């Protein structure tokens, strides 16, 4: 059993339900202002998350880190509990690489079409879709 002073609890939830919950010695997230590492007893924080991977260190050093593709949302940390509320999130082993690759190709096509039509709103949506697809692919391939 992990010593509470040496670990924190991480919970990741989406509109579809809980994706992840575990204890960790360190959580690493990318906020809109840059990377943030959270250790036990960190000061309370709330931050908006970028579309990127969340890395959760394992209590046992010989185990691989858990990696989760998170597509926006926020992290709130207090009392040694980190709660990530994400628009969507997928654990590394749950990512369908073929589906993510198809999403990447569709997004690239949408970007080209939006640029040709000078449709700024569609271009912005397509760029977000591309970032989400690339995030899923990057996490799946680690």
UniProtKB/Swiss-Prot annotation:
Keyword field contains Membrane: yes
Entry keyword Magnesium: no
Entry's Gene Ontology molecular function annotations: ATP binding; proton-transporting ATP synthase activity, rotational mechanism
Gene3D superfamilies with a match to the protein in the record: ATP synthase delta/epsilon subunit, C-terminal domain, F0F1 ATP synthase delta/epsilon subunit, N-terminal
Gene Ontology cellular component annotations, sorted alphabetically: plasma membrane; proton-transporting ATP synthase complex
Membrane topology classification: Peripheral membrane protein
Pfam family for this entry, one: ATP-synt_DE
Primary localisation category: membrane
Cysteines joined through disulfide linkages: none
UniProt keywords, alphabetically: ATP synthesis, Cell membrane, CF(1), Hydrogen ion transport, Ion transport, Membrane, Transport
Xref: InterPro entries: ATP_F1_dsu/esu_C_sf, ATP_synth_F1_dsu/esu, ATP_synth_F1_dsu/esu_N, ATP_synth_F1_esu_C, ATPsynth_dsu/esu_N
NCBIfam families: ATP_synt_epsi, PRK00571.1-3
Main function: Produces ATP from ADP in the presence of a proton gradient across the membrane.
Family to which this protein belongs: Belongs to the ATPase epsilon chain family.
PANTHER family, alphabetized: ATP SYNTHASE DELTA/EPSILON CHAIN (PTHR13822), ATP SYNTHASE EPSILON CHAIN, CHLOROPLASTIC (PTHR13822:SF10)
Assembly and binders: F-type ATPases have 2 components, CF(1) - the catalytic core - and CF(0) - the membrane proton channel. CF(1) has five subunits: alpha(3), beta(3), gamma(1), delta(1), epsilon(1). CF(0) has three main subunits: a, b and c.
Protein's name in the database: ATP synthase epsilon chain
Organism of this sequence: Lactiplantibacillus plantarum (strain ATCC BAA-793 / NCIMB 8826 / WCFS1) (Lactobacillus plantarum)
Lineage, broadest ranks: Bacteria, Bacillati, Bacillota, Bacilli, Lactobacillales
Gene symbol of the encoding locus: atpC
């Amino acid at each position: 059993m992990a010593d509470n002073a040496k670990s924190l609890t991480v919970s990741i939830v989406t509109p579809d339900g809980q994706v992840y919950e575990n204890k960790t010695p360190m959580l690493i997230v990318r906020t809109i202002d840059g990377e943030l590492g959270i250790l036990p007893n960190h000061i309370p924080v709330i931050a908006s998350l970028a579309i990127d991977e969340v890395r959760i260190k394992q209590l046992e050093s010989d185990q691989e880190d858990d990696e989760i593709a998170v597509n926006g949302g926020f992290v709130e940390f207090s009392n040694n509990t980190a709660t990530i509320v994400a628009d969507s999130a997928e654990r590394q082993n749950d990512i369908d690489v073929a589906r993510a690759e198809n999403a990447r190709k569709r997004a690239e096509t949408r970007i080209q079409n939006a640029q040709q039509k000078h449709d700024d709103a569609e271009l912005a949506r397509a760029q977000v879709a591309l970032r989400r697809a690339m995030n899923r692919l990057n996490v799946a391939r680690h």
